[in-house]
From Swiss-Prot:
The keyword Cytoplasm applies. This is Ribosomal RNA large subunit methyltransferase H. Disulfide bonds: none annotated. It is an enzyme of class 2 (transferase). It catalyses: pseudouridine(1915) in 23S rRNA + S-adenosyl-L-methionine = N(3)-methylpseudouridine(1915) in 23S rRNA + S-adenosyl-L-homocysteine + H(+). Gene3D superfamilies: 3.40.1280.10. Homodimer. Specifically methylates the pseudouridine at position 1915 (m3Psi1915) in 23S rRNA. It is found in: Cytoplasm. HAMAP family: 23SrRNA_methyltr_H (MF_00658). Its EC number is 2.1.1.177. The gene is rlmH. It comes from Syntrophobacter fumaroxidans (strain DSM 10017 / MPOB). The lineage of its organism: Bacteria, Pseudomonadati, Thermodesulfobacteriota, Syntrophobacteria, Syntrophobacterales.
Length: 157
């Protein structure tokens, strides 16, 4: 199985980018993991948000094309899982012969309805709102944590 992390827009804070890269490097010991960046649109005037989300959605769908075996979208409206439940989801996907898992973290306006509807799973990080850079770091860390749980390694306590 491969993991593809799709981020809308660039990571702003270099220290956060370093943290994301560190977790992705650790993840690569378990399975191939790649980060893909999709261009973010500028924040539009009020009432034009859906047009921006549609453009970003088009870019994401062009990137993943027909390659997506599993699409997981991170969105505030998603399901809440703890780390053990998230590990079980990934373990089922891995054991089920899933070739690739595409995980999408949207930009400042979130994720389009079309992407949420296409997703096999919509997950939320928290009831709280996080900066997108921090959300990316949390997802990368939780992926690493999940695979240490699956392997029975001592990282997760």
């Amino acid at each position: 199985m491969q993991i593809h992390l799709v981020f809308v827009g660039k990571t702003v804070f270099p220290d956060v980018e370093t943290g994301i890269e560190r977790y992705v490097s650790r993840l690569n010991h378990y399975l191939p993991t790649r980060i893909h960046y999709v261009k973010a649109e500028k924040i539009p005037p009020r009432g034009m948000e859906s047009a921006v989300l549609e453009k970003e959605c088009e870019r994401i769908l062009k990137l993943i094309g027909g390659k997506s075996n599993q699409l997981i979208v991170w969105d505030r409206t998603g399901k809440h899982l703890d780390s053990l439940e998230f590990a079980r989801v990934l373990e089922r996907l891995s054991n089920g012969g899933t070739g690739a898992v595409w995980m999408i973290i949207g930009g400042p306006l979130g994720i389009s309805r079309e992407l949420r509807d296409r997703a096999n799973l919509v997950l939320a990080l928290s009831e709280m709102t996080f900066p997108h850079d921090l959300a990316r770091l949390i997802v990368a860390e939780q992926l690493y944590r999940a695979f240490t749980i699956i392997r029975g390694e001592p990282y997760h306590k």
